[in-house]
A protein has these predicted regions:
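Active-site histidine-anchored catalytic micro-motif
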Residues: 2-101
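Aromatic-acidic/polar surface patches that form glycan- and anion
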Residues: 29, 140-143
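Short Gly/Pro-enriched loop/turn and capping motifs at secondary-structure junctions
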Residues: 59, 156-157
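A general structural signal for well-ordered alpha-helical packing
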Residues: 76, 116-119, 147
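Active-site rim beta-loop-alpha module in soluble metabolic enzymes
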Residues: 85-141
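Short, hydrophobic/amphipathic alpha-helical patches that form generic packing surfaces
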Residues: 145-156
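Conserved small/polar residues in nucleotide/adenosyl-binding loops
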Residues: 158-165
Length: 167
């Protein structure tokens, strides 16, 4: 559509999907599906040439509103209605991918100013009491959320191309 973002990420997705490369293209999507949907709208022929690993959707099978879906529900519909192979990781699954706060204190906080800053940002967001409406931060653990996509990337390939884009 005319309102599809014109950005580096969309162009990169299209170029990578159209590459003459026997290795499969896995896209570990984090956040909204806006750029993926825009690439599919611009070049629908890329759908069969990629697999999207996506953290999104409420608990299976009932579902409910979920942050990554709510950011751009139309883009989610474009993705799910396409021929793209989607490995969906719903909230009840990705919420189990946790790291302890003590491990973050041990491995992140001592990493200079950036590590101390990141650790403090997590602590500032950490609730002082359990909230059953927000199960992502409970007890002494922090759910890593969207990072679950990296954990399920196939590791059997000898090369993986990584590229970060921002729209």
């Amino acid at each position: 559509p005319e309102d599809a973002p014109d950005c580096e990420a969309v162009e990169f997705l299209i170029q990578e999907a159209l590459r003459d490369d026997p290795a499969p293209l896995y896209i570990a999507a984090q956040g909204a599906m806006t750029n993926i949907a825009a690439a599919l709208n611009r070049a629908p022929e890329i759908a069969s040439r990629m697999t999207v690993l996506w953290n999104g959707g409420g608990p299976y099978p009932a579902g409910r509103p979920e942050f990554n879906v709510q950011q751009d529900p139309i883009a989610c519909r474009v993705l799910l209605d396409s021929a793209v192979t989607v490995w969906q990781i719903p909230q009840d699954v990705y919420a189990k991918f946790e790291v302890s706060l003590s491990e973050l204190a041990l491995r992140v906080r001592p990493c200079g100013e950036v590590g101390a800053y990141l650790f403090q940002q997590l602590m500032d967001e950490y609730p002082s009491e359990y909230d059953p409406r927000f199960p992502l931060r409970t007890g002494g653990n922090w759910t890593l959320g969207d990072n679950t996509t990296a954990a399920v990337l196939p590791v059997s390939y000898t090369h993986l191309r990584a590229h970060e884009t921002r729209s």
